[in-house]
Structures are given as structure tokens and as C-alpha cells.
Amino acid sequence: MHEDIAKWFSDPKHGADTQDMDLVLADVEFLPQLKAYLDDPAGTEFKKVEVVSALLELLEHDCPPDRGAESVRLAEDIRTTIRQHADVAQRAMSDVGPVKEVVLRSILGLPVPPDYPQWIVDRAHEEGA
């Protein structure tokens, strides 16, 4: 693992000001560390939200249903992880944008606000809702 990424997981202050860290972390190679960070009581709230966002990026980009059984297993693992950390996922909703919010709502079994445009809901389904 790259030294900066290892430090991001181990040092609560490291990388807190790094923009788009969720995109950097959205790598299947880091999935065990992402899951462990969500389980870590010492993990910061801000970074846990980044982890949820990274998981959503993985779900969107690495789990298309037409890629076969491996992709389906990965998607279910990510969804299960998000469900296990529903409290963090719900707090992340205001930070991930409307499409990913709908993805989270779908994973958590929460209703989509009725005033959300249909295109947002449709896009969320494309991204793993």
C-alpha cells in the first residue's frame, strides 16, 4: 500500500484536507482497510464519511452487473458493509450529492424524497441503487 494511503488510515489528521480522497481510496485493493476503518472506534467521523463515499465509487465503477459473479459478490459485500454502518451512511448522505444519496437510501431501505427528479433516481439505479 502506498505510504500516504497507509498514513491516511493510521493518522487521524493526515489527509483531512485532501480533496477527492474518496476517489483515491476507491480501489478494490483497499476494501479490507476501508471496512476495518468503519469498524475502528478511533476512526474520525470525517474520514468514515470519506470511506462511505469511496465504497459508493467502488460500487459505481467496479460492480456493473454485466461483469459476472465476481462483480455481483463485490457489490453485495459493499452493500452489506454500508448496511452494517447505517449510522455513518446516513450522516454521509448530505455530503455525497443527490445521486449517491439515493443509492445510499436504496441500500438502507429508506424512502427517496418525493420531490427528487426522476433523472436522479434513474442515475442512482445506474450507479448501484
Where are these regions (language model features)?
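Eukaryotic intrinsically disordered, low-complexity regulatory tails and linkers enriched
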Residues: E127-A129
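Intrinsically disordered, low-complexity regions enriched in Ser/Pro/Gly/Gln/His and often acidic
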Residues: M1-H2, G109-V112, V121
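Short terminal alpha-helical segments
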Residues: M1-K35
